[in-house]
């Protein structure tokens, strides 16, 4: 509510010290001042959960499972950080000691400065990871399967001293590793999880993936830029993975086709053995379905053969993201029959 009244600034700028530090009198004063806002958003959340539970029950009844995302980090100005500052690496005044990001690489000489507060894993361990387990339990009430974003940070996370203009001076710090997941299973039982393990995997991440047994991710759009050595090529998959033509953070397949190098496109057509009359998007969908991956996921934009105008998200940008909407009229019987036939031929239909 406070941030909404000053939309051009973050909470760190808007809060006076007394409300930023959750002074009891200040909190009560703002509760009175923002009562209408608070009541409105309580109602919105109530209606969301009411409608979502109905929707999930309906699709589950059709044999459909929902896979949802959980970002590993929360925002600096999130309710989680404000209400639970002890969970994060913060100074006494609430400013971060270090923040999250990624180191410099081939794509960025200065790395990625995300700015999220980092977890105080020592404190979390001392409290038996209670907050994290409650978070995962809440996600499991929304989804049948939870995809944990940036899973590698449980093995080791990149820590950038605050303040910083870029990610050059960060360092890798050991995460909670397998102990976290062993304790999670003891506390919550078996939770269906997909680990987002895209990018360069270090030995500690590979070891954690093997220890947890969680399926990782393969993205076909990443497969065709470095020849036979590329780990995203389908012949290198294990069964315990989820293959995507692309994710919400990628361009659509047809959008990728517009910008990819000619040699990469040629290699993709050759590898996928695409006949001249097979649309490129359907060639990649076919290869995803025919792979040994246990699960194949295809964004609707790729099924419809849409271009870059239908891209869902461009990472690290603001505005214009998550605005694409599916037109129900596009869901034709012909399209359903085509997907069914492809599923049958690739052995992806249950008896």
Residue ranges and their predicted role:
Residues 32-47, 111-130, 165-173, 271-275, ...:
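The substrate-binding groove and active-site-proximal loops of carbohydrate-active enzymes
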Residues 41, 46-74:
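Conserved, well-ordered alpha-helix/loop/beta-strand core segments that scaffold catalytic motifs
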Residues 305-351:
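Structured C-terminal cap/extension of enzyme domains
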Residues 87, 191, 197-308:
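Conserved alpha/beta catalytic core and glycan-binding cleft of carbohydrate-active enzymes
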Residues 81-106, 170-180, 214-224:
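Acidic, His- and aromatic-enriched active-site or binding-groove loops in soluble protein domains
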């Amino acid at each position: 509510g406070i941030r909404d009244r000053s939309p051009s600034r973050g909470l760190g700028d808007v809060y006076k010290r007394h409300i930023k530090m959750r002074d009891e009198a200040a909190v009560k004063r703002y509760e009175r001042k923002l009562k209408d806002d608070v009541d409105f958003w309580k109602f919105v959340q109530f209606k969301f959960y009411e409608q979502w539970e109905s929707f999930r029950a309906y699709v589950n009844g059709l044999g459909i499972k929902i896979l949802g995302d959980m970002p590993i980090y929360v925002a600096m100005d999130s309710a989680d950080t404000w209400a639970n500052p002890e969970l994060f690496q913060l100074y006494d005044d609430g400013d971060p000691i270090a923040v999250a990001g990624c180191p410099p690489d081939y794509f960025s000489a200065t790395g990625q400065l995300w700015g999220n507060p980092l977890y105080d894993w020592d404190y979390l361990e001392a409290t038996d990871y209670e907050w994290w387990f409650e978070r995962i339990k809440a996600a499991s009430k929304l989804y049948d399967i939870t995809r944990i974003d940036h899973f590698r940070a449980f093995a080791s996370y990149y820590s950038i001293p605050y303040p910083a203009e870029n990610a050059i001076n960060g360092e890798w710090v050991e995460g909670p590793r397998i102990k976290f997941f062993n304790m999670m299973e003891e506390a919550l039982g078996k939770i269906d999880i997909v680990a987002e393990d895209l990018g360069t995997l270090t030995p500690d991440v590979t070891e954690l993936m093997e220890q947890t047994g969680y399926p990782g991710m393969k993205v076909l759009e990443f497969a065709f830029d470095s020849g036979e050595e590329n780990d995203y090529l389908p012949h290198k998959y294990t069964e315990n993975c989820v293959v995507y033509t692309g994710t919400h953070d990628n361009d659509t397949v047809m959008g990728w086709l517009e910008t990819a190098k000619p040699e990469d496109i040629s290699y993709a057509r050759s590898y996928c053995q695409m006949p001249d009359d097979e649309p490129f998007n359907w060639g990649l969908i076919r290869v995803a379905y025919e792979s040994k991956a246990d699960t194949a996921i295809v964004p609707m934009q790729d099924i419809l053969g849409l271009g870059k105008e239908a891209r869902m998200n461009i990472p690290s940008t603001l505005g214009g993201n998550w605005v694409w909407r599916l037109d129900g009229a596009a869901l034709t019987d012909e399209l359903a029959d085509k997907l069914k036939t492809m599923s049958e031929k690739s052995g992806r239909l249950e008896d």
